[in-house]
Amino acid sequence: MKTFVLHIFIFALVAFASASRDSAKKIGSQYDNYETCLTEHGLTEDDVFSIGEVSSGQHKTNHEDTELHKNGCVMQCLLEKDGLMSGADYDEEKMREDYIKETGAQPGDQRIEALNACMQETKDMEDKCDKSLVLVACVLAAEAILADSSEAA
């Protein structure tokens, strides 16, 4: 049975909702097609941004545009292999359904609102790689903010 382990939004939830967050972990590194996507795009694990870099936005200032694009291509590859993207197009309903199924989020949950906002923010981007990285960064940043606000509460 095909699992949804590549679902990048679940990755964001696990990364930031977990009490033992590992901000040094590479985005997408725990998924089955990670090595395949790295190989397809000519990257090594050292080339991939960490969760901490992406959630804080440091990836935008610490890396060249070509590195940003290549990381985005790896994210797009993971999303596409899980059937959540085709080229530069999201399957928004499938993303929501998978996210809800995997996280147990309920209607009105701030995580779903964040996912929807991130998809809306990126929907008109045409480059599939850039679009994927911006989407992932948006979700990771939102998850970090939500995790911080719930820890403070």
Swiss-Prot record:
Gene it is expressed from: Gp-9
GO terms classed as biological process: response to pheromone; social behavior
Subcellular location: Secreted
Cystine crosslinks: 37-77, 73-129, 118-138
Functional note: Colony queen number, a major feature of social organization, is associated with worker genotype for Gp-9. Colonies are headed by either a single reproductive queen (monogyne form) or multiple queens (polygyne form). Differences in worker Gp-9 genotypes between social forms may cause differences in workers' abilities to recognize queens and regulate their numbers.
Quaternary structure, from the entry: Homodimer.
Organism: Solenopsis daguerrei (Workerless parasitic ant)
Signal peptide feature range: 1-19
Keywords: Behavior, Disulfide bond, Pheromone response, Pheromone-binding, Secreted, Signal, Transport
Family statement drawn from the similarity comment of this UniProt entry: Belongs to the PBP/GOBP family.
Listed Gene3D superfamilies: Pheromone/general odorant binding protein domain (1.10.238.20)
InterPro entries reported for this sequence: PBP/GOBP, PBP_GOBP_sf, Pheromone-bd_protein_Gp-9
GO CC, one annotated term: extracellular space
Molecular functions (GO terms): pheromone binding
Name of the protein: Pheromone-binding protein Gp-9
